[in-house]
Amino acid sequence: VRNRYWTLADEPVTGWPQQDTFVLKEGAVPVPALGQALTRTIYVSLDPYQLYYQRERTGPEGAPCHARTVSQIIESRMDGFAAGDFVFNTNGWTEYALMGEGVWRPGYMVPRKLDASVGRISQAVGVLGMLGLTAYAGMNLMASPQPNEIVVVSAASGGVGQIAGQLAKQRGARVIGIAGRDAKCKFVTDDLGFDACVSHLSPTLSADLAAVCQPGIDVYFENVGGKVFEAVLPLFNQAARMTICGLIAHYGDEDGGVDRRAALMKRGEPIFKTRDVRVMNLSVSEFAGQHEEMLAYLAPLVKAGKVKYREDIRQGLETIPTAFAEMLRGDSFGKMLVQVSPDPTLGARGPGKSRQGPFGTVA
């Protein structure tokens, strides 16, 4: 058995991913040392923050591109983990990887065993994982919407947005989504239960949003920036709150949008000051200690169908770069995942036919 994985090409990563950004390589399956476990990747989570890791070349040189993953242990020499266990870990864009002692990972992304009875194991990198924690922290712990307040969520059909809006509904707020094409807006209202949804593709976005946000916005969960923020800005009520989760509209900028939060603050400063708007930057790593609290709150809601969650699952390791680019462009529909090996909890159903997309080259 050989191991295939995607790594970065030698050229610096700027702007959006290009055809030659990633290279598919093949090597030996690693052997676990004492304190390590060998795992087979089942699901790879694709998220906007990974583009920053790629630009900064975070992690070991030549290693697989970073990603959060759901995996199964093949061989363990690591206390507390046994062969057959399902785990959350950070294998990245690869079929096999080690976890444990001496294996690089972001500090707060600690490997943990998964209980398949709590929810689908894929949810460990979605609604019951970092995305769920992001939504829970940003909405419940930071913005804290109250009954009958008006809450607006941008990228409302995305991995974080769909959860954040439903959490606000659970608290009795009136929730307005901002999404893209009509099918996404329909999903946000009909399936997720938002009170209304407007399209950022509309030439009358500002007027559309104002019409459904009377008498103004009390909470804004920001995932986008750009023209969406411009439409929201004049609608803030007195003492409103804004949680800045992401600014995906700027991730394709040559500088990666690194100064966009400062620019956004400067653009909004006159209204923020006169209307006493509280602006909060969300960094999910600061809430790692609330993971179990989030699970205790959110898992029962998901299991009971009170919080719904859509995944966009692509099939096969070869599709990862293309799926990643589509996610960044907003062409995905729900939380973007790639399944690279069979999920035994679903009757060992393996990934479907792979296709080589337009992004990435084979070494």
Predicted regions span which residues?
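NAD(P)H dinucleotide-binding glycine-rich loop of Rossmann-like/cofactor-binding domains
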Residues: A67-Q72, A83-A155, C197, K306
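Glycine-rich beta-strand-centered segment in the early N-terminal region that forms part
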Residues: A28-L46, Y52-W93
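Glycine-rich phosphate-binding loop and adjacent beta-alpha segment
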Residues: K227-V307, S341-A363
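A glycine-rich helix->loop->beta "capping" turn
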Residues: V212-V219
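Mid-domain Rossmann-like dinucleotide-binding core that forms the NAD(H)/NADP(H) cofactor-binding site
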Residues: V125-P203, A207
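Glycine/proline-rich active-site loop of Rossmann-fold NAD(P)-dependent oxidoreductases
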Residues: R329-G334
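Short glycine-centered segments of the SAM/dcSAM-binding site in methyltransferase folds
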Residues: F86, I150, R174, A240-M242, ...
